[in-house]
Amino acid sequence: MSKHNSVWVLDDDKSIRWVLEKSLSRSGLSTQCFENGEDLLHRLEKERPDAIISDIRMPGINGLDLLSTVHDQYPLLPVIIMTAHSDLDSAVSSYSRGAFEYLPKPFDI
């Protein structure tokens, strides 16, 4: 159901999606990018990646709500949360909802 070594990237910022897609592709990973959580959840009904990288603050469904939904339905699917608004509450919320990892922006690729 999933492509081998596939990572889905969710961020409302086009430049972040572009940078992550280029970097992950150079590492040999198949990458699919999404602008909003609704599209990602719809696609998740049909196929599964090996991991998801998601921003927290986005219009529509935010990254933490997406994380909760994914973790409830697919508890073994790793979700990495990234945010430019890094604080202790965001980190605790991410890990308590099942995040595999928490990345404060900016980060080195």
Predicted features and spans:
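Short amphipathic alpha-helix used as the core "switch/output" element in two-component signaling
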Residues: 39-42, 64-76, 93-96
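Acidic catalytic/metal-coordinating carboxylates
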Residues: 5, 35-36, 62-65
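Active-site beta3 strand of CheY-like receiver
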Residues: 47-53
